Amino acid sequence: MKLTKIIGLFYLLFSIGCSDFLDEYSQTYIRASKISDYDELLLGAVYIPSLTPVPPTYYVYPSGSNVCDFLNVLDDDSNVTTEAEINRAGGDKPINEWVAMHNVLFGYTTWQQFITNTELTEHNDQTTWVQLYQRIAIINSTLAEIDDIDVKTDEEVADYYRVKGEYLFLRGQFYLLLANLYGKPYDPETASSDLGVPLKITAGVEHDKDKDTQFERTSLDRIYAQIVDDLKASLEAFGHSSKHVLYRASEEAARLLLSRVYLYMQEYEEAKTVLEPIFSNITLSSLVSGDTLGGNNRFLTEENSEMIFSQGSQFSEVCWTANAPDFCVSRDLYDLYDENDRRKGCFTLNTGTDSIALSYKYNTGNYRARVSDVLSMRAAEAWLNMAEACAMIGGASEGTANEYLNTLRRNRIVGYADRSYSGEELVNQIRLERRKELCFEGHRWFDLRRYSVCKKYPYSKKIYRSFSFYTSTYALDRIETYVLEENDPAYVFAIPRTVLEFDTEPMPDNERPERIPLESAD
């Protein structure tokens, strides 16, 4: 079966009306006949690809037009470089491209009420929503049929379990992203009434012409229950057949993601239990025994032994140069690192702007960057998740939490001596280490959300963001400062306008406040 026929079928759903789609479906649908068809579909239409710059001399940069590419400009680890004029000396993109990136990310990084409709730019905000639901539609149809495939050889049986496990993993991951972008953070006390996103796990198109609302938002507790079910089912499938390949989901990836889900749900015993088997199959890389970061020596590459899984592109290679109007690393983050902490070598001081650049965490350059900065998974998170779970359990488990925390630090900080913490201080140290270790990897925004509803040790903070506005001749016009309040409604994204407009009576939206600058500096 040709991959293009399979992919084309599912994309009809988003290009023509529902009733027309049903007619088209009955006329053109061709059932996959062997497990390799589903494997081919998985690679071609379900995994999020790593983008190749076009033309090849350009970079791929965040613009809201790729799945979750904006995540790392939302939180308190980044800021915007402010200078009297735009300075792209030595840059590889035309200045208008850098200005376009600056303008389109304004709504995201300053948490505007309408993130894609601002004074600087106007475009649609549906990309992440649509692309994830497109993939979920393919997964749903595949899972409805894959058990009917006739597998005969041992190799085919192994491939069946592996491929099915990957589909289940990806549906769980995609719904987790959607729920944490368009729903409130999971609060066990309110999850049964808090609205998430539409939950659909069945195949086919369900359209009732007599209903004014076709899509309804599902409560967070039901969405998370489905995510857990999918990831548990993927683990069961991977138990029969799993290969640890960086760009394919595996048992290790499923265990790590499920532990993250349990932390979001504040189910710490479950997080600990699902993680325990993983440590015999993964390793931490050591920064203290190798060369310092710099030059061609970068931290997160395909060759790093602690990489578990990655899909999608890498955008941090280009944004955090600390040249105006690019982004820079916040001083708040930079000052957290001890001078003996080798991770500090990821950052460099841009002497021209006195701002901090993210220089050596990822490969940089105009090429296909394969390790994602928003959708990759690695061993360090497993150590941090286990430490957090044990710290929250408390009692004798605090000793285990300290062991995992100290192990990670010994591999990052030269001359580090083990320390012992307890109670809230232990949790705070783990959160601190998580921020330093996983910065610019798509974690911090979601972590800040979940900390705010943590029952045992809640935490929230204000985030300040300065943003530079430039004239048509690239001279500085003004600098405005915005603030994201503690527990701000803008921690939840609005439902895309095109989704709301589809129905006569739209699903409830997430209200975001108008974002007024605190001050304006000329």
Give the location of each predicted region:
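Extended ligand-binding clefts on enzyme/binding-domain cores
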Residues: 39, 45-70, 212-222, 265-266, ...
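Membrane-proximal, proline-rich intrinsically disordered regions
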Residues: 18-86, 333, 346, 416-420, ...
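TPR-repeat structural position
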Residues: 224, 268, 396-398
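Sec-dependent bacterial lipoprotein signal peptides
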Residues: 1-16
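Alpha-helical solenoid repeat scaffolds, predominantly canonical TPR units
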Residues: 138, 223, 230, 237, ...
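Conserved, well-structured interaction surfaces
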Residues: 98-183, 218, 233-241, 367-379, ...
